[in-house]
UniProtKB/Swiss-Prot annotation:
Its main location: Golgi. It comes from Sus scrofa. InterPro entries: Nuc_sug_transpt. It is found in: Golgi apparatus membrane. It catalyses: CDP-L-ribitol(in) + CDP(out) = CDP-L-ribitol(out) + CDP(in). Residues 40-52, 107-140, 199-214, 272-279 are lumenal. Keywords: Golgi apparatus, Membrane, Sugar transport, Transmembrane, Transmembrane helix, Transport. One of its GO terms (molecular function) is transmembrane transporter activity. Residues 1-18, 74-85, 162-177, 236-248, 301-324 are cytoplasmic. This is Probable UDP-sugar transporter protein SLC35A4. Found in a complex with SLC35A2 and SLC35A3. It is a multi-pass membrane protein. It comes from the Eukaryota.
Length: 324
């Protein structure tokens, strides 16, 4: 199976080793986000504006891309690049920005546990757009693998971790902050459906752009993150009065920004040289990293639901990428 069909590059050689390392780093950085964010809490809350962290992350990615072009880590095109090729990335930035804001607004219409479980529907929406927009076909075996990924995510979100002081398992989001009553509203379900659709569309659309344009990945990322910085700068400025850009930041917060920036760059490489489906497996496998770090850093206990989720993920990987 080829890379563009959602598979892995050819086995053997240094290229395969680099690809494997990139996937492992992507999984680690994605899974570390929630535990690192929990370590930033002061008196049970994040002491800085979320928009500040997003803006600084986008700015860090932009600077790293510019640096890679300036020092020659990636070659600049032989002729002046057609800057009109930057315009399509504005839509990618807009879709990602809309998704980030929907996540915040969804918390007003449902509890974090319900959101964590239902948000796994974005796996299905990504697969749908992958087939429709890229004209790829998934076999029954591959479709079953993606269903197992959805089940694994829902299983882990429903109770993969437990606070030692609580008799009941909790979702990763509530295990560190305390229990929240389960609730969901009709507007919340509609917003969640919109979130899942935008999530799938943004991933597949960005993959299409990255693969269609014959430009260095760093230059494509430069286009994307320029729009991302402008969009998030506007959102931050329009967010009303609040803490300053760096107010409340600590060493842990800086690590969150750096890890998220690295993750964004790695994910773009995954989608250019792999696929949106590969990205789904990276995100799902990151649950294992999330759980292990939560247990080690936050003193949370792993439950049977976590081990079931890990088993389902392993089975899904075998079904999708294993020998036919």
């Amino acid at each position: 199976m080829s890379v563009e069909d959602g598979g892995l590059p050819g086995l053997g050689g240094p290229g395969q080793a680099r690809w494997t390392l990139m996937l492992l780093l992507s999984t680690a950085t994605y899974g570390a986000h929630a535990p690192l964010l929990a370590l930033c809490h002061v008196d049970g809350r994040v002491p800085f504006r979320p928009s500040s962290a997003v803006l600084l992350t986008e700015l860090t990615k932009l600077l790293l891309c510019a640096l890679s072009l300036l020092v020659g880590w990636q070659a600049w095109p032989p002729r002046t690049p057609p800057w009109r090729q930057a315009a399509p990335f504005a839509l990618s930035a807009l879709l990602y920005g809309a998704n980030n804001n929907l996540v915040i607004h969804l918390q007003h219409y449902m509890d974090p546990s319900t959101y964590q479980v239902l948000s796994n529907l974005k796996i299905g929406s990504t697969a749908l757009f992958y087939c429709l927009c890229l004209r790829r076909r998934l076999s029954a075996r591959q479709g079953l693998a993606l269903l197992l990924l959805m089940a694994a995510g829902a299983c882990y979100a429903a109770g993969g971790l437990r606070d030692p002081g609580s008799p009941l398992p909790e979702s990763p989001s509530t295990a560190a902050s305390g229990p929240v009553p389960l609730h969901v509203t009709a507007p919340g379900l509609l917003l969640l459906l919109l979130y899942c659709l935008i999530s799938g569309l943004s991933s597949v659309y960005t993959e299409l752009l990255l693969k269609r344009q014959r430009l260095p990945l760093a230059l494509q990322n430069l286009f994307l993150y320029t729009f991302g910085v402008l969009l998030n700068l506007g959102l931050h400025a329009g967010g009303g009065p609040g803490p300053g850009l760096l107010e409340g930041f600590s060493g842990w917060a800086a690590l969150v920004v750096l890890s998220q920036a690295l993750n964004g760059l790695l994910m773009s490489a995954v989608m250019k040289h792999g696929s949106s489906i590969t990205r789904l497996f990276v995100v799902s496998c990151s649950l294992v990293v999330n759980a292990v770090l939560s247990a080690a850093l936050l003193r949370l206990q792993l439950t049977a639901a976590f081990f079931l989720a890990a088993l389902l993920i392993g089975l899904a990987v075998h079904l999708y990428y294993g020998s036919r």
